[in-house]
A protein has these predicted regions:
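Phosphate-backbone recognition surface of nucleic-acid-processing proteins
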Residues: 104-122, 291-293, 299-314
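Hydrophobic, well-ordered secondary-structure elements that form the walls
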Residues: 78, 93, 117, 229, ...
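Acidic, metal-coordinating catalytic cores used for nucleic-acid/nucleotide bond scission
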Residues: 66-70, 270-278, 297-299
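Secondary-structure capping and boundary motifs in well-ordered enzyme cores
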Residues: 35, 39, 66-74, 89, ...
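Basic, amphipathic alpha-helical segments enriched in Lys/Arg and hydrophobic/aromatic residues
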Residues: 312-354
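Polybasic low-complexity intrinsically disordered regions
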Residues: 98, 107-283, 351
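Basic, low-complexity intrinsically disordered segments
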Residues: 13-18, 28, 43-150, 165
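Charged, often Cys/His-bearing segments associated with DNA-binding zinc-finger transcription factors
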Residues: 1-49, 192
Length: 354
């Protein structure tokens, strides 16, 4: 009896109870849930400033008839989240925004607002997620007052990389009426040994704008598009982007187009040996841009008048950082292989990614 009384007199452990009780009311806001030092806070402020400056541009994209659509600002913020958090698909993006309070706050949804369907992105792709809107967004970011504090406007580097297309070798058939391989299954076997295949005679049925490409002699050929970037040298920020088909002239032509659009007279541009061509060097000098290209062993388009300066050595050292942007794009940005068909859509995705 004494033992029983002793047990009953033991203090109760102060352990919380695992009660599953849904609260009817919430006395907090999304704003209170997000830490003041969260890295998305300054990004949200920057994005809101840019989107506010595009208000009149958005008005021109929508009809005056019918019911109101989902705000374009929310769709673009959601697309940025997809890039930043490496979300594989728009279906997954919608699911995560629905239950993630941080994502809801960034997009501009309240805790009670219903999330839209994933097909909304496809329905708005031609209107909102196109090259023109993406480039306008990109240019407005560069026009912010704070941009000049981080980015140089005098020293740049250019380079290109391959982005795998959403197409397989089996879709690469003859242009004169060839048929894809068939064996009665959804994924038929195909043997291309001994067959000469080139972009002049073959074309992909999945993505007609993709080209059979390889970046170097030891690289495997695959269907791809080319992405080109221009990086400033102060902090390694990407200041311009182009998307082209793969051919022997694409890198030089895209680089010159970006120089015409971005570089001012008196600038320098670093590049690898592929840009050590008379056409690139001559046109860069016509734009009053000094070409700090890596020299070929034979037949270089530049000489000691360019390479003797300390700035040339600095450009050759810093230009290699442009590969970091490509690495980020293909890993975090999820663009090692695009899920979109055509260069126009890929170009918009590249601009939002950088």
């Amino acid at each position: 009896m004494a033992a029983i009384l002793f047990c009953r007199s033991q203090p109760k452990p102060m352990r919380g109870l695992d009660l599953k009780q849904n609260e009817l009311f919430s006395y907090t806001t999304l704003e209170q849930r997000i830490p003041n030092d969260h890295p998305l806070r300054p990004l949200r402020g920057l994005v809101d400033t840019v989107l506010a400056s595009m208000d009149r541009d958005f008005d021109g994209l929508y009809s005056t008839l019918g019911r109101a659509s989902i705000a374009p600002e929310r769709l673009l913020r959601a697309s940025l989240l997809q890039v930043i958090y490496t979300i594989r698909s728009e279906r997954q993006l919608v699911e995560q925004i629905d239950f993630n309070l941080l994502f809801r706050w960034f997009v501009g949804l309240s805790m009670d607002e219903r999330m839209w369907d994933h097909s909304t992105f496809s329905q708005n792709r031609d209107r909102l997620f196109n090259q023109d809107v993406a480039r306008l967004f990109f240019q407005r970011i560069k026009s912010l007052a704070a941009w000049s504090e981080y980015a140089s406007n005098e020293h740049f580097s250019v380079d290109g990389t391959l982005i795998d297309a959403w197409a397989s070798h089996k879709s690469f058939i003859k242009k004169d009426g060839g048929d894809p391989p068939e064996d009665g299954t959804r994924n038929p076997d195909a043997d291309f040994k001994g067959e000469k295949r080139s972009n002049a005679t073959h074309q992909s049925t999945s993505d007609p704008e993709a080209r059979l490409a390889r970046k170097s002699n030891g690289d495997a050929s695959r269907l791809a598009h080319m992405a080109h970037t221009m990086m400033e040298h102060r902090n390694g920020l990407i200041v311009d982007v182009e998307c082209t088909e793969f051919n022997g002239r694409a890198e030089v032509e895209a680089a010159l187009e970006m120089l015409e659009r971005t570089a001012k007279p008196g600038s320098t541009v670093g590049a690898d040996k592929n840009y050590d061509q008379k056409r690139f060097v001559q046109r860069a000098r016509e734009l009053k841009v000094t070409p700090h290209v890596a020299q070929k062993r034979k037949g270089s388009a530049i000489d000691g008048r360019t390479t003797r300066h300390p700035g040339y050595a600095a450009s050759q050292k810093i230009r290699k950082r442009i590969e970091e942007g490509f690495g980020w794009l293909k890993t975090v940005g999820g663009l090692r292989k695009t899920k979109l068909i055509g260069r126009a859509k890929l170009s918009a995705q590249l601009l939002l990614g950088f």
